[in-house]
Amino acid sequence: FYSSILPNLYSYILVHSKRISTEALNSQAAALRMRGRPKVVLARTYEEAMEYYDKYADNILGVISDVRFPKDGVKDPEAGIKLLREIRRRDEFVPLILESSETNNREKAEKEGFRFVDKNSKKMNIDLRHLMEEHMGFGDFIFRDPKTRKEVARIASLKQLQDNIFNIPYDSMLFHIS
C-alpha cells in the first residue's frame, strides 16, 4: 500500500511547494521556500510513530495513519486508532486522517472525530488530496464567518490576500488570526 500512496503524496506536496515558491520575490527566496516544504515521515510501528510525533510535534501539519500495524511488538488491529487518539489527546487541533480497507473503520474514525479515507475507493488519491487541502492547509485559505461557518472569502496567493485584505469581514479576520 505504501508504494502506491507515497509517490502520489510526494508529487502532490512537490506541486504545492512549487506553487508557493513562485510567489517568492527572488530566486534565493524561492529556493528557501522549496527547502522549507513539508516532509513526509513513514513510521512502521506505533512506537516509531510516537517517537516521530514527539520529535516533530511543533511542526506537524497532520497525521495520516493506517489502522492495523505493530504496537508493543505485536500486530494490533486498532493501533492506528490508538495512535490518533493519543495524538488528539496531546493536540486537539492537528488534522488526523485514518485510512483503511475495512469500511467498518469509517464509523470508528468518525466517532473519534478523525477524517477517513477508504483504501478500496477508486478515487482514494482524490479523497486524500481533498482532505489535505481542506484540513492541512494545502489548498486555498478559506475565510469563514465565525458564527455560520460559511465561506466569506477564498485566497489562493499572497497577492490575492494583499488585494483583498480590506474586503474580508473584520470578525472573520479576527476569528482566523486568534
Where in this protein do the model-derived segments appear?
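Active-site residues of response regulator receiver
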Residues: I64-G73
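A generic structural signal for alpha->beta connector loops
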Residues: R37-K39, F93, G113
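Acidic, metal-coordinating helix/loop segments flanking the phosphotransfer/catalytic sites
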Residues: R19-G62
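Death-fold homotypic interaction modules
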Residues: G137-S178
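Output/docking surface of receiver
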Residues: F1, L42-R44, K75-D76, I97-K147
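Two-component signal transduction core modules
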Residues: V63, I87, F116-K119
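Conserved acidic segment of CheY-like receiver
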Residues: F1-A30
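Short amphipathic alpha-helix used as the core "switch/output" element in two-component signaling
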Residues: E51, D72-F93
